[in-house]
């Protein structure tokens, strides 16, 4: 018997059975307990979801922007009222500590919906005078039906981030959560319906990558917003372009540099580094996993990091005292342990962790100890490839030019940060780093107002911020002639 029972698809404002006849299981990564059986969508189910979305989108787009704004604000209120309930589900599904999901996941998702609800009425065109008797005006119109494909690390937050600008602009969305963490997207669908979003405007289809491919290649989808790995992102872009030249937004992987200069407050720098590597058990795309420290302060910095790692409270995610939980799945655990083994084999110095935790209740979960490597080199696998787990690599440097060149020597470009008391150096360095999200003397916050996304192979487009709203609309240009028409023939 599973905790949450059979989970169905959400199409047309309510739950429906999938036609595939297939289900998949989702488990609690802390205990191995079966959480739910989830119905897998078929191609016919995806077609049904898209058709429902097309119908609902016409009704939604016909509303005034103020009407849409009010409905989205009601959804925000419902999310906040149910914060504790949703956080409990998210903790069971992801393995995140309850203190984290209560404070972050639903809260930040609701914040983004509230932000775009406020911007819905500000979607405006332009008026351009040509001459005394002629002018051009532009309209920003919704794209139509969009697809959202979520990642497993922030299930409900990502669903909110993708739906908020899409719905605010008058679009509908068919959303596929990760099959690893599929539960809370369905709760968001219930909330949107209760808030007054018309049937079909937000549909949820479940399944593996084959379902994502059906959405990406669907001729009636106008845009795909994807969060996930680089290789999958390339496939999404290829299929989206080949099928119908869809608009694409992608937030992909990272191997982000955190640079600690010799004048940094080392206590602050250590706090930042530990957060940038071990928050959410290291399963954050923006993690600052390449920690470059000036050689003159490396030992003092490393000592401070190790002191803080000892204070990390690994435990049951449902325990309020826990601030570090398991990895999301057995597959992710195996991947992370493989990277740790490669670090040892390539000569990195293991300073902390480096093992799976199996004592007591840890034995049934996917736990790995917070891990710190020193004496790392740029050519090591743990330094070059995204791990997506709690593994910090400490590297030293001598000069500003050197560290910038090394920090940029990667095909990723998602995030970067510097810690220094010299503001001129901070801005100078940040301006030279090839990354889309940057922090100075802090790490990790991504407020609704801040556009987030990557350079290079870390993504295309942005999520959050005003600029994202524009990419959920298309521009129609209209010339108006008030004077005499001069015939050509």
Curated annotation (Swiss-Prot):
The record marks 247 as: Seems to be a necessary countercharge to the potassium cations. NAD(+) binds at residues 150-152, 176-179, 229-232, 253, 285, 386. Binds 2 potassium ions per subunit. Its cofactor is K(+). Its EC number is 1.2.1.8. Involved in the biosynthesis of the osmoprotectant glycine betaine. Catalyzes the irreversible oxidation of betaine aldehyde to the corresponding acid. Dimer of dimers. This is Betaine aldehyde dehydrogenase. The gene is betB.
């Amino acid at each position: 018997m599973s905790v949450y029972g059979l989970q169905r698809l959400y199409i047309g404002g309510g739950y429906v059975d999938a036609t595939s006849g297939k289900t998949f299981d989702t488990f609690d990564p802390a205990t191995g307990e079966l959480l739910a059986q989830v119905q897998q969508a078929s191609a016919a189910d995806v077609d049904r979801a898209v058709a429902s979305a097309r119908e609902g989108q016409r009704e939604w787009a016909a509303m005034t922007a103020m009407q849409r704004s009010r409905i989205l604000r009601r959804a925000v209120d419902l999310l906040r009222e149910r914060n504790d309930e949703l956080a409990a589900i998210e903790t069971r599904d992801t393995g995140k500590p309850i203190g984290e999901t209560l404070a972050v996941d639903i809260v930040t998702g609701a914040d983004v919906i509230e932000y775009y609800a406020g911007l819905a009425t500000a979607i405006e065109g332009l008026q351009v005078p040509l001459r005394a008797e002629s002018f051009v005006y532009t309209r920003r119109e919704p794209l139509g039906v969009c697809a959202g494909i979520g990642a497993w690390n922030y299930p409900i937050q990502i669903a909110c981030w993708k739906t908020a600008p899409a719905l605010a602009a008058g679009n509908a969305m068919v959303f596929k959560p990760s099959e690893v963490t599929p539960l809370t997207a369905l709760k968001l669908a219930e909330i949107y319906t209760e808030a007054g979003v018309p049937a079909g405007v937000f549909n949820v289809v479940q399944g593996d990558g084959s379902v994502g491919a059906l959405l990406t290649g669907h001729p009636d989808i106008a845009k795909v917003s994807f969060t996930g790995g680089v290789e999958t992102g390339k496939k999404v872009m290829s299929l989206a372009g080949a099928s119908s030249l869809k608009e694409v937004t992608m937030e992909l992987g990272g191997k982000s540099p955190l640079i600690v200069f010799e004048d940094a407050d080392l206590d602050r720098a250590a706090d930042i580094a530990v957060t940038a590597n071990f928050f959410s058990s290291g399963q954050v795309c923006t993690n600052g996993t390449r920690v470059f420290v000036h050689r003159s302060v490396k030992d003092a910095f490393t000592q401070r990091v190790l002191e803080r790692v000892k204070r990390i409270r690994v435990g049951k995610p449902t325990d309020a005292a826990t601030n570090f939980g398991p990895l999301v799945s057995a597959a992710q655990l195996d991947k992370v342990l493989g990277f740790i083994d490669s670090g040892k084999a390539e000569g990195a110095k293991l300073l902390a962790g480096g093992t799976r935790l199996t004592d007591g209740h840890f034995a049934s979960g996917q736990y790995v100890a917070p891990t710190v490597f020193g004496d790392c080199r740029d050519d090591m696998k743990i330094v070059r490839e995204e791990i997506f787990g709690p593994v910090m690599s400490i590297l030293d440097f001598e000069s500003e030019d050197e560290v910038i060149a090394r920090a940029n020597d990667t095909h990723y470009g998602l995030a970067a940060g510097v810690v220094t008391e010299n503001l001129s150096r901070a801005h100078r360095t940040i301006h030279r780093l090839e990354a889309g999200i940057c922090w100075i003397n802090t790490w990790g916050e991504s407020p609704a107002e801040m556009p987030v996304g990557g350079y290079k192979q870390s993504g295309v487009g942005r999520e959050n911020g005003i600029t994202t709203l524009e990419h959920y609309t298309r521009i129609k240009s209209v010339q108006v002639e008030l004077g005499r028409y001069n015939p050509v023939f």
